[in-house]
From Swiss-Prot:
Matching HAMAP family: MurE (MF_00208)
Task performed by this protein: Catalyzes the addition of meso-diaminopimelic acid to the nucleotide precursor UDP-N-acetylmuramoyl-L-alanyl-D-glutamate (UMAG) in the biosynthesis of bacterial cell-wall peptidoglycan.
Binding site for UDP-N-acetyl-alpha-D-muramoyl-L-alanyl-D-glutamate: 21, 117-118, 144, 150, 152
Catalysed reaction, written as an equation: UDP-N-acetyl-alpha-D-muramoyl-L-alanyl-D-glutamate + meso-2,6-diaminopimelate + ATP = UDP-N-acetyl-alpha-D-muramoyl-L-alanyl-gamma-D-glutamyl-meso-2,6-diaminopimelate + ADP + phosphate + H(+)
Motif Meso-diaminopimelate recognition motif, chain ranges: 364-367
Descriptive protein name: UDP-N-acetylmuramoyl-L-alanyl-D-glutamate--2,6-diaminopimelate ligase
Entry GO CC: cytoplasm
Length: 447
């Protein structure tokens, strides 16, 4: 990426920064090369021409980000927690930017479409500069485990870091669950302000300036009582000092969101906003009623019968969704991404087999893999094959599920969430789970 930035380095003034060797070699007088862990193997092309190289660790010396950066990481819940905080801060009349899986937003306006959960370092710096230019006070961002390892957040001073949870994901990249956990936990080694899920047993963090939330354990933000039916209601209790039981803030909250795991997301977001703004709980909590969730995250696409679309693509993520509907007859429709961690596929089958009375296995984003091979991997975890239907064409699979769905059942369409493409080996097509469902019921209504 080429970023417009006038700076003087090694007695030469440049007009741009770039992490792309081709761009730099085309115009070396104007563009300064920024070496990062991702492009390091190509940096010899620049060195051979005796051109200047700016190491990514030096980048922060040429930027002055007068903005409070909030980084949210975790296996699940990053997008909802980030979006919830963004919504709360905007409702509190705070100028705020949001960067993550859904794109880049500033003050309720979409600046960029979807991209990586955490962009490249230069793109991130560019987004921060834009937020500063528009006088944002807060910059809320999702931080992926890839970004932590690849140092795509290098040089940023976080006003607050938040951990949602740590289960298992991206083992194709991290190679082991231990490496994955270490990557997540490394984000919380400093003494900066942090919000931690106290119920997360895999969390390791520096206790200095750590504030916690929990449903089960004692924490700074606890739930005294809650109901998940029909949506989330709870009595929240905040204690700034856990050693002083006399000073507490208590507030009743109501949210349109569904599910126990969204209650965790709410706790993380509310505690984060409270620490940033220092406002009373009773000022923040009523604003939760204005946040209706994120498209593709436990999204109700049709109500009678109930059809829900969710992004869940990890074992823990799927279990959380299933738990939200455990008292209903569940039909689970899902696949698994190609060219990704294969070890989780049988476990996905096993968790679906435990909760669902009917399973429809289909394609997700097969990429370079054979769809049938992916489905066979999932089938290894399912003991009772009589409850399984295999239809690799995702559209046909959804239509089949809808045609056979009874009023007392819930159809959970998992894996893709709000994605509107499907990636195959030789092509990428437009595809939306939501559009297939809506189109089906629209045609049904028209007779």
């Amino acid at each position: 990426m080429k970023l417009k930035k006038t700076l003087t380095y090694q007695n030469h003034t440049y007009s741009f920064l770039s992490d792309n060797t081709h761009e730099v070699l085309e115009n070396p007088k104007e563009i300064l090369f920024v070496k990062t862990p991702l492009n390091e193997k190509y940096s010899h092309l620049i060195a051979e021409k005796n051109l200047a190289i700016l190491d990514f660790n030096e980048l922060k010396n040429y930027f002055d980000f007068k903005i409070k950066i909030v980084g949210i990481t975790g296996t699940n819940g990053k997008t909802t927690t980030a979006s919830l905080m963004y919504s709360l801060l905007l409702d509190l009349n705070k100028k705020t930017a949001l960067l993550g899986t859904r794109g880049f937003f500033i003050n309720n306006e979409r600046i960029k479409e979807k991209g990586l959960t955490t962009p490249t370092l230069l793109e991130l710096y560019s987004d921060l500069e834009e937020a500063v230019r528009l006088k944002c006070e807060y910059f809320i961002m999702e931080v992926s485990s890839h970004a932590i390892v690849q140092k795509r957040i290098a040089g940023l001073d976080f006003a607050l870091k938040i951990l949602t949870n740590i289960t298992s994901d991206h083992l194709d990249f991290h190679q082991s669950i231990e490496n994955y956990r270490d990557a997540k936990n490394s984000f919380f080694k400093d003494e900066g302000l942090k919000v931690i899920n106290r119920d997360e047993t895999n969390a390791l963090f520096n206790p200095v300036n750590a504030h916690t939330y929990a449903l089960d354990k004692k924490a700074h933000l606890n739930v005294q009582a809650f109901s998940l039916n029909p949506s989330i209601s709870a009595s929240l209790c905040y204690q700034q000092d856990l050693r002083d039981p006399n000073f507490k803030e208590i507030a009743l909250m109501h949210s349109p969101l569904l599910g126990r795991y969204n209650l965790y997301n709410i706790l993380a977001g509310v505690l984060g906003v409270k620490l940033l703004t220092q406002l009373p709980l009773e000022t923040i909590v009523p604003l939760l009623e204005n946040f209706y969730g994120v498209k593709g995250r436990l999204e109700i696409v049709h109500s009678k019968p109930l059809v829900v679309v969710d992004f869940a693509h990890t074992i823990d993520g799927m279990q959380q969704v299933f738990e939200s509907f455990k008292n209903q007859k569940i039909t689970a429709l899902f696949g698994a991404g190609g060219d990704r961690d294969k070890t989780k596929r049988p476990e996905m089958g096993a968790i679906a087999s435990y909760y669902a009375h009917k399973i429809i296995l289909t394609s997700d984003n097969p990429r370079s893999e054979n769809e049938e091979d992916i489905i066979k991997d999932i089938l290894k975890g399912i003991n009772d094959s009589s409850k399984v239907i295999v239809e690799k064409d995702r559209k046909k699979a959804i239509l089949n599920a809808l045609e056979n769905l009874k009023d007392d059942e819930v159809l959970l369409i998992l894996g893709k969430g709000d994605e509107n493409i499907q990636i195959f080996k030789d092509k990428t097509i437009f595809f939306s789970d939501q559009e297939v469902v809506k189109s089906y019921y629209q045609h049904l209504k028209q007779g």
